[in-house]
């Protein structure tokens, strides 16, 4: 059961964090805000995911894993794995924006690859698991980036 929380929390953490960053970049907002919004979202969403998982299991769970451990695993995975795409933004004062954006893309891909590999270790279908996780992650990023780009260009002028 902890493995499913790891995959669930990590996947949602990466997609949520990258979606925020992609939205900021798509709306052409200064990348320095990605760190502020990314960290705030990472912790608040991680807490929400963990506590929601805990409360959803507390009265109905007959599993070997306690609802607390399930919720904790979801939170920890969300924050640790979801924080990987945010790491390059800690180096904004040392590198240019292009480097930061590229590092974010590569670190995001690495985080998704790790989740897919862990899932693949469980299912024994490595390529399928990694491909599935990567496609879902890419879809989340594209939705966020293009939504922000559209909103900035068509609905909100002068941001």
Model-identified regions with their sequence ranges:
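Membrane interface segments of multi-pass transport proteins and intramembrane proteases
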Residues: 90-99, 156
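Juxtamembrane boundary at the C-terminal end of a transmembrane helix
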Residues: 145-159
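Residues that define the loop-to-transmembrane-helix transition and helix capping
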Residues: 31-32, 98, 127-128
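Cytoplasmic-side transmembrane-helix entry/capping segments in multi-pass membrane proteins
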Residues: 127-136
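Hydrophobic, small-residue-rich transmembrane alpha-helices and their short perimembrane loops
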Residues: 1-88, 101-107, 111, 140, ...
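Short helix-capping/hinge motifs at transmembrane helix termini and TM-loop junctions
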Residues: 27, 89-93, 122-123, 152
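Transmembrane alpha-helical segments of integral membrane proteins
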Residues: 108-124
């Amino acid at each position: 059961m902890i493995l499913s929380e790891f995959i669930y929390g990590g996947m949602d953490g990466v997609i949520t964090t990258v979606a925020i960053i992609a939205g900021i970049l798509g709306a052409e907002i200064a990348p320095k805000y990605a760190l502020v919004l990314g960290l705030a979202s990472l912790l608040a969403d991680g807490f929400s995911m963990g506590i929601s998982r805990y409360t959803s299991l507390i009265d109905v769970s007959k599993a070997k894993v306690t609802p607390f451990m399930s919720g904790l695993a979801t939170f920890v995975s969300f924050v640790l794995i979801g924080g990987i795409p945010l790491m390059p933004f800690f180096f904004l004062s040392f590198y240019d924006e292009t480097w930061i954006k590229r590092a974010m893309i590569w670190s995001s891909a690495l985080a998704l690859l790790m989740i897919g590999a862990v899932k693949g270790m469980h299912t024994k279908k490595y390529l399928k698991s990694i491909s599935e996780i990567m496609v879902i992650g890419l879809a989340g990023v594209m939705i966020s980036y293009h939504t922000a780009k559209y909103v900035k260009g068509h609905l909100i002028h002068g941001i």
